[in-house]
């Protein structure tokens, strides 16, 4: 029997957010956000952003316990400081790089203090916009050195690197799964992993299900963010709203590879009810998950292995789409 997945929410999306044109939702304290998550059906975890949203470790842990919640991950922000604007981990200034490394190390210490088992980091400020904008080799060496130093600190709390094609930079240095794996191979710290965000993979022109297989075959762990978009930008829509069958295949391969960590909603409820948005993510995901778990898996595997797609499509029509 395949266990129903565990769900968590990134706390940033539970309060006021903004884009270039509008602000959305009302600001909330961390305590209010945690109470909101506790009231969400099917969700029992949070990914909290360090150092801006968490407060003292003892107070955070007490609030989590009071609401019956668990820490899915601590998300360390290495882009928001003014000196990180042009890159923190890859800055040409050694002092700036050292500060970014310190942020990650302190996030690991914080995760340990609050009962978390991982830190995830998306180095969005590290990238470039133009031809001849930077020395690519130097930037890569800085990534290897800085993330390697941070990853080696407190190895019992693994550091997961999240890749993304762009934003805040025109092109992020760590912009796809293959490059993220190359980075970890160069770093050589076994207690590291990769955060796979479904939407980042989609608008990066990857197939998220294929990426799951790639990461599962690697020596590194992986951790999952769920959402959707139009394939052109990281809109962070609700799951399966734009890429239904891609999401179904993604969940199928999570099952096939034995993924048993949190599915964390990295979803932005701008114009939609916050609680309803995240409950929809959990509800739809669980229903698809259960549907996949009830399939004749041996038959489905044989069909996929035979590569006769018309036969496979008939199976999908009947058993998954119920057409």
Annotate each language-model stretch with its function:
Residues 65, 112, 255:
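Anion (oxyanion) recognition and catalysis
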Residues 3, 83-193, 314-322:
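Active-site acidic/histidine proton-transfer and metal-coordination neighborhood
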Residues 50-53, 78, 123, 228, ...:
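Residues that line or immediately flank small-molecule/substrate-binding pockets and catalytic motifs
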Residues 74-80:
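Short glycine-enriched loops at secondary-structure junctions
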Residues 45-47, 73, 120, 160, ...:
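Conserved beta-strand positions in the central sheet of alpha/beta enzyme cores
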Residues 1-42, 109, 117, 148, ...:
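Histidine-acidic metal/acid-base catalytic patches
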Residues 44-65, 123, 127-131:
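Glycine-rich, proline-tolerant flexible connector loops at the mouths of alpha/beta enzymes
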């Amino acid at each position: 029997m395949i266990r129903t997945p565990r769900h968590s929410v990134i706390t940033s999306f539970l309060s006021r957010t903004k884009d270039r044109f509008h602000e959305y939702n009302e600001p909330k304290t961390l305590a209010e956000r945690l109470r909101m998550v506790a009231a969400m059906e099917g969700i029992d975890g949070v990914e909290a952003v360090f150092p801006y949203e968490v407060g003292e470790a003892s107070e955070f842990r007490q609030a989590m316990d009071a609401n019956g919640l668990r820490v899915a991950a601590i998300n360390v922000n290495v882009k928001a400081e003014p000196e990180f604007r042009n890159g923190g981990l890859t800055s040409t200034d050694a002092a700036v790089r050292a500060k970014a490394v310190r942020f990650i190390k302190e996030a690991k210490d914080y995760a340990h203090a609050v009962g978390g088992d991982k830190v995830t980091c998306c180095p969005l400020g590290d990238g470039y916009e133009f031809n001849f904008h930077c020395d690519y080799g130097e930037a890569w060496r800085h990534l290897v050195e800085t993330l390697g130093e941070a990853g080696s600190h407190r190895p019992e709390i693994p550091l997961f690197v999240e890749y993304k094609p762009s934003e805040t930079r025109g092109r992020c240095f760590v912009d796809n799964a293959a490059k993220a794996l190359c980075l970890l191979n160069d770093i050589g710290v076994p207690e590291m992993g990769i955060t796979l965000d479904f939407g980042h993979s989609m608008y990066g022109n990857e197939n998220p299900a294929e990426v799951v297989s790639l990461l599962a075959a690697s020596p590194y762990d992986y951790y999952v963010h769920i959402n959707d978009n139009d394939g052109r930008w990281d809109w962070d829509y609700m799951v399966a709203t734009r890429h239904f069958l891609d999401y179904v295949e993604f969940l199928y391969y999570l099952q096939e590879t034995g993924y048993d960590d949190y599915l964390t909603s990295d979803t932005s409820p701008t114009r939609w009810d916050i609680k309803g948005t995240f409950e929809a993510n959990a509800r739809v995901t669980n229903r698809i998950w259960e549907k996949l778990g009830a399939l004749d898996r041996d038959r489905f595997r044989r069909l996929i292995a035979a590569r006769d797609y018309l036969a496979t499509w008939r199976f999908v029509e009947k058993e998954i789409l119920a057409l």
